[in-house]
């Protein structure tokens, strides 16, 4: 019987959540892409075909693929879920009480397929057929968004992350992504796959403003044996790490959290853009984060709900200790310094492990893939000329929901 549990980064992957890029990407333009956290606009049809190849590769490895749009449609079929989502996404504070009421009424009358498409992909004022007495729509331009598109939903890794016997519903750093978490809150609460199942919601499920306690799943590596590795990047804060760690310890789901301070720039957006776990003793690492000046801490439960925080000198040694290994096999990004920088930018280090020693990655990263092959790692390559321009690889685009221990 399947279960909602992720025990490692490298054990057999059994179920995963993806989101095929569709309507949201059609709303990306050169003038708004940076606000929506993209560096460029993508060819939507080509990106969809590349994503299909990714999903098919997973299925060929025996992995069950769940698609976010399908889960949203099923969830919206539950009246309580639909009402909750419309209330939180179309709030009086966001739109004003008059326009929020009119917009909720219009959306509530849509069929669930169309509504899911709008909530994920956005809606412009020019596409809105209703009239409202509110001042707000009269002050907007036709191409302004009534509902902003969520192109970053492509990266299902970030919005929620499963850690051992539970899930963190992550308070996202950037406003362009904060609505995403509510979709996962609804799915995990009401969708038939999850409703009534025995799993823990560690963090982010309350109707709270989490202030500076931000965490994103791309920074969270479940390295196994009760250990969790978390990067403090430009998107994940120490406050977020400590809150998640406290809840993991409170529920007895982790024995330690290793936290690494990452350089705060775009190429190190998340830990998994510079480091991924490929086999029990093997990691892919971009050389920049092998510097000795990166601060590292080890968080452990101290009893009575308190934590001990210990400064460490070397995060790689901390990983060895956590996994009971004498030595880690580190594979650095391939090519000379120019090639390595280019391939890291194109997500060479952001691979998804489907079972020990077998990973999925972009075919374009030829130098790094060659290094993986020589080290005994099998790379199942997928096209990524368009998807890669979104600055996310196979790990970014996947949220494991069921994975074996190591």
From Swiss-Prot:
Intrachain disulfide bonds: none
Pathway noted in the entry: Amino-acid degradation; L-arginine degradation via ADI pathway; carbamoyl phosphate from L-arginine: step 1/2
Residues annotated as catalytic: 396 (amidino-cysteine intermediate)
EC number assigned by the record: 3.5.3.6
Subcellular location: Cytoplasm
Keyword check for Cytoplasm: yes
Highest taxon in the source lineage: Bacteria
Annotated Pfam families: ADI
InterPro entries found in the cross-reference section: Arg_deiminase
Gene Ontology biological process terms in this record: arginine catabolic process to ornithine; arginine deiminase pathway
Record field: catalytic activity: L-arginine + H2O = L-citrulline + NH4(+)
GO molecular function: arginine deiminase activity
Principal cellular location given in the protein's record: cytoplasm
Keywords: Arginine metabolism, Cytoplasm, Hydrolase
CC annotations in GO: cytoplasm
Family named by the database record: Belongs to the arginine deiminase family.
Listed NCBIfam families: arcA, PRK01388.1
Protein name per its UniProtKB record: Arginine deiminase
